[in-house]
């Protein structure tokens, strides 16, 4: 029987999630897109009709400027994005998906569907709403830095 201490359960949950995300990421060909790169690809796809700048990705993912810079470099190296001059103001650089990035966004969708199905398949809407409220309170507690 697993430990019922909430902190121990969270640690176990995080470990198990990391393992499942890794396994399903490999199965769907998105092992390096299961984290921030994947979220950035989806954000770019959802905003293809707009100019998206590095600062927009930083804000959306709630990560620091240096982390965003490294993320952009990795994504460029992996061929998922290009950083090109803005069409409005050439001084600014916008981030656009490459054809590979667009194709991988579909794989990310399939991965997200699979992971959501595995996690939430036999949990009722009511249970999800209750757990959502509990997680919201936990997040609020963690975000309150005193």
Describe every region a protein language model picked out.
Residues 1-31, 78:
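N-terminal leader segment of winged-helix/HTH proteins
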Residues 10-13, 17, 21-24, 61, ...:
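Alpha-helical linker/hinge and terminal dimerization helices associated
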Residues 73-132:
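Charged, amphipathic alpha-helical coiled-coil/dimerization segments
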Residues 22-64:
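N-terminal helix-turn-helix DNA-binding core of bacterial DNA-binding proteins
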Residues 11-14, 41, 98, 132, ...:
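Generic structural concept
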Residues 54, 72-73:
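Short, hydrophobic-biased segments on the C-terminal half of alpha helices
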Residues 1, 125-146:
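C-terminal regulatory/oligomerization modules of transcriptional regulators
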């Amino acid at each position: 029987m697993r430990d019922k201490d909430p902190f121990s359960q969270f640690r176990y949950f995080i470990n198990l999630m990391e393992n499942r995300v890794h396994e399903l990421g490999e199965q769907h060909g998105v092992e390096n897109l299961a984290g921030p790169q994947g979220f950035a690809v989806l954000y770019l796809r959802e905003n293809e009709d707009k100019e998206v700048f590095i600062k927009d990705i930083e804000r959306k993912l709630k990560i620091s400027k240096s982390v965003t810079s490294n993320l952009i470099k990795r994504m460029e190296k992996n061929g998922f994005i290009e950083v090109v001059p803005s069409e409005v103001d050439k001084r600014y650089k916008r981030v656009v998906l490459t054809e590979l990035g667009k194709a991988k966004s579909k794989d990310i969708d399939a991965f997200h569907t699979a992971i959501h199905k595995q996690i939430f398949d036999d949990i009722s809407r009511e249970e999800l709403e209750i757990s959502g409220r509990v997680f919201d309170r936990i997040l609020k507690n963690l975000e309150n830095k005193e």
